[in-house]
Amino acid sequence: MEQIVCQLLTDPPMPGPVNMAVDEVLLETVTRTGSPILRFYTWSEPTLSLGYFQLFSERERHPESLSCPVVRRATGGGAILHDRELTYSLSWPRRELPPGVDRKATKGSEWMYEWVHQSLIDVLAELGADAQFCKPTAGAEKSFLCFERRSGWDVGLGDVKILGSAQRSYRGGVLQHGSLLLSASPFTPQLAGLSEQGFPLGLDPLT
């Protein structure tokens, strides 16, 4: 896979509203400058983020996280409990394609899912983890939590989903952000991360 050139940001832990605001500002910036921006970040406290089309009342479906602050993402998909994970965002000018991507062979900005997720699969392979794209699960989109859903662009390790992403298009730009589960959170103990799969990684090897 050919490399792409992006402005790289690595931010310290910040509250949910700040993290979401920064991602939206970066998307707006890309629409003006045409230069892609890749950002890695974490959260200052366990936070539940709702997909754009989820209702705030739906958080009652996950009582374990009712004590956590809640924010709404600009992107769709299921809710995510941001705790022991690494979050990334990629803001990209919609009119541009990286080397090796055929506009006729890709649907809209779907190439970004494959590009980013395959890059992570390659990094994990170097660390000894055999991650793969997930097989879609029928009916899983009804689940409240993102990591209880499966699409063909998600990344799994064995039968465990470890990476999910979502997108939003805005004027001349596309925002894609996603979460990589490093280990299970006490608020979502049923969702295993890399640590439970035998790969107790910190943030440095991945960023």
Regions found by a protein language model. Give the residues of each.
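Internal, conserved structured core segments that host functional sites
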Residues: 84-152
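Aromatic/basic-lined ligand-recognition segments
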Residues: 150-167
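Long, positively charged amphipathic alpha-helical accessory segments at protein N-termini or as interdomain linkers
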Residues: 117-141, 145, 169-207
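Short loop segments at secondary-structure junctions
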Residues: 53-54, 93-96, 160, 184-187
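A glycine-rich, hydrophobic loop/mini-helix early in the fold
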Residues: 56-105
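Active-site loop/lid in soluble adenylation, ligation, and acyl-transfer enzymes
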Residues: 1-61, 69-73, 79, 146, ...
